[in-house]
Amino acid sequence: MFDTKKVLELANKDFEKAWITTKDLIKDAPINKKYPRIKPSFGKTNPVMDTIEQLRQAYLRMGFEEYINPVIVDEKDIYKQFGPEAMAVLDRCFYLAGLPRPDIGLSNDKIEQIEKLGIKIDSNEKKENLRKTLHLYKKGVLEGDDLVYEIANSLGLSNEMGLKILEEVFPEFKNLKAESLPLTLRSHMTSGWFITISEMMGKKPLPYALFSIDRCFRREQKEDKSHLMTYHSASCVLVGEDITLDDGKAIAEGLLSQFGFTDFQFRPDEKKSKYYTPETQTEVYAYHPKLKEWLEVATFGIYSPIALSKYNISVPVMNLGLGVERLAMINHNYEDVRKMVYPQFYEQTLSDRDIAYSIKVDKVPVLDELKDLTGELIELCVKNKDKQSPCEVFIEKKIKFYNTTKTIKITLFEKEEGKNLLGPSILNKIFVHNGNIFGVPESFDNVKEEFVKVLSEAKNKGAPTNLTYIDTICYKITSKIEEALISNTKKLKIRAPIVRSLSDVNLKIDELALKQIMGNNKVIDIRGPVFLNVKCEIND
């Protein structure tokens, strides 16, 4: 915080001077808190959920009402809808199963086993309570997840002892096997529409325009890049006396044009499902101008009067359905549905920006005075980098360290004749391009021709870190000085000859980024001569 009264006093005396000098009140960010080593934090949605919401809004804009269809479908409904081909269809359905309730009595042998656990059943009341609990469970009155608690409660025991009784006295529970039920998980939205429409007939005036977007489950032989065992169906129905196949074409165009598709083709579907009227099952192909190709995106048809009659539905019903995942793959440019739906099971790809964010300065001083000294040292290096050797330049500064004042003198030197004070790579900058990390020089004059194109692309198209070699090395120097202050060391020397790795320029990279670079055979190439020689003296 700064003193506002003092600032205003200075401004009243000399505004221009105050305007310039008060810039020092706004502190610069620490080196590892400067952009691009900071980035905005925000949540991320899944493409499937995005597409579901887009489809919901698209249907609503077209005047459809949203309904939730039953997920659990009795197998008899599959027979009603598919007729003779029901058995083949049921092969792709998941059946539900449940554990039977064992008929467990409380015999004298069971009571003896309980008492061997150190539990006294010394009254008829306790026996009756336990017997009643087991009976209620058998009849389905008592839920399975309450059984341990109720066993313990009937005998006045802790939950732990109730569980022990269940495990050691009633092994029947361990041997239970699930028994199949005549109930299936919905394999396609049509199974739910027949049930829904049947219930709505006579309750709501015709016509109906309904849609539902929800999960379906299909027992695929295996999952691959285009098939999952659970997927989302975006399905709609038009129900009314004058419904025709042309309504399906219009709905398909109206819906899909909201997702960037332009031209449409309607082709007879060779599958010919029995719940559709013959010659009405139609595949929708749509042209996507960005992808420049025709894509199969939906199917529609008119439900068979035979199937409708089994549900007392006496008017035509047009049904259109499409796979949400299919549309999401098109819109988000995915080739494998598994990677889109379940990204957590696959390697995450870091962008160049992400990698640039992951590169940090390793050693940084904590004291503000040393951070300021770092900036002054960088200026000294840049200003004198081309000074001819033998030569030396120095910077001297007093800083407060606990209750003492220390004088720090940093000297840059080069003793060998005919050289510059510093090597030609000190102003190289770090860029990330195509997953590679490069040290890019200011000028390409002395760069081998074979490297010019790569380095030029990195400079012009890559993600910058805004870090030069001299910046990061100077932070290492002042960090070493801070360590010397703490250990009461008076003198130290630091050399930075030829750079070969990130650590040579006081940089580190997050493990995930490094793993990606190595795993994808990318490179970290920041080679370059720095030839920096430093000696430091610390005096009271």
Swiss-Prot record:
Pfam families: SepRS_C, tRNA-synt_2d
UniProt superkingdom: Archaea
Binding site for substrate: 188-190, 233-235, 275-276, 319
Main EC class the enzyme belongs to: ligase
Gene Ontology terms, MF aspect: ATP binding; phosphoserine-tRNA(Cys) ligase activity; tRNA binding
Coiled coil: none
Quaternary structure (record): Homotetramer. Interacts with SepCysS.
NCBIfam families: sepS
Identification of the protein by name: O-phosphoserine--tRNA(Cys) ligase
Phylogenetic placement of the source organism: Archaea, Methanobacteriati, Methanobacteriota, Methanomada group, Methanococci
Primary gene name: sepS
